[in-house]
């Protein structure tokens, strides 16, 4: 049985939730990246969502268009998709499919790498590093992006300063 390593309905539901609720996006922002989406148009829309968030702009259609050229048909499909309640489960499934796609893509390169005229230890070391790079995100999903941490820290400092006054 051929397994699918992408789910466009799943991707649309995640994007719909992020667009409909900034809180939903904030809850999963560090868990996925644009490359986790299999469809380039979905990657572009998620990049625009990230840009809106980073610029402290509303995550809305008008602002999304400002940051990235958006495929209007794909955006309409996303907006017609109901947002979901169990977003973390959907995000986890998206991430799992993404890692499997990356591993499958890497596996296709192995015969070429193995046939290179280099020492086996060098080839094995390189392959090990690449596999670690792909799978490391699976084990470090709770680690937030440094820009996000600094932004959150700065916001907390502002709140504390306001409370002191």
Where are these regions (language model features)?
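Noncatalytic partner-interaction/assembly domains of nucleic-acid and motor enzyme complexes
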Residues: 1-99
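Signal for well-folded cores of large energy- and translation-related assemblies
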Residues: 19, 95, 132-135, 154, ...
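Phenylalanine-focused residue identity feature
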Residues: 37, 46, 63, 106, ...
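Interdomain "pre-motor" coupling segment immediately N-terminal to P-loop NTPase/helicase cores
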Residues: 83-150
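The Walker A/P-loop phosphate-binding site
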Residues: 141-165
């Amino acid at each position: 049985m051929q397994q699918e390593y992408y789910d466009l309905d799943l991707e649309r539901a995640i994007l719909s939730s992020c667009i409909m609720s900034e809180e939903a996006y904030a809850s999963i922002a560090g868990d996925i990246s644009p490359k986790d989406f299999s469809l380039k148009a979905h990657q572009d829309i998620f990049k625009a969502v990230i840009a809106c968030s980073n610029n402290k702009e509303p995550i809305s259609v008008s602002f999304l268009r400002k940051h990235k050229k958006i495929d209007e048909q794909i955006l309409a499909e996303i907006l017609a998709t109901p947002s979901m309640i169990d977003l973390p489960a959907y995000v986890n499934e998206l991430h799992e499919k993404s890692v499997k796609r990356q591993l499958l893509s890497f596996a296709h390169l192995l015969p070429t790498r193995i046939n290179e005229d280099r020492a086996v230890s060098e080839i094995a070391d390189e392959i090990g590093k690449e596999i670690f790079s792909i799978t490391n995100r699976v084990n470090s999903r709770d680690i937030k992006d440094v820009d996000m941490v600094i932004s959150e820290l700065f916001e907390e400092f502002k709140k504390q300063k306001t409370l002191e006054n």
